[in-house]
Amino acid sequence: SAHLDDQLRDTLAAVAPVADVAGILRVQAEVRDVDVKEPVAKYLLRIVARTRDHRSLDLGVSPRGALAFFRAAQARALLHGRAYASPDDVQALARPVLAHRLQLTSQARYGGTTADSILAAIVADVAVPT
């Protein structure tokens, strides 16, 4: 109704922006500056590689998905006040960043397997750098 439209318009007009373009670009640059040492990068890539040859997956993580995973690990490190990404960042983000990027085989899907469970098993199985 017109009354609801007016209410919505008033509510949206009262919402203050939380960031501007310059602020977003600045944070993106800060994320890219977070250091990812070679052992952590290789760890992340081993997890990605395991999705590409997993028997329950028709489609694993793409190169673009791997880059998103890498950037997410950098962003998590920054949010935790660190200038470097750690294996903990990689482990914490594997499922939330990668699960929707996987395509399960029909057999796995109908057998009750989930992308989350596959990623949990991969993360548990890939050796963590020390």
How should each PLM-predicted stretch be described?
Residues 42-45, 51-130:
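C-terminal engagement/docking regions of AAA+ P-loop ATPases
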Residues 1-46:
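Conserved AAA+ ATPase core "coupling" helix
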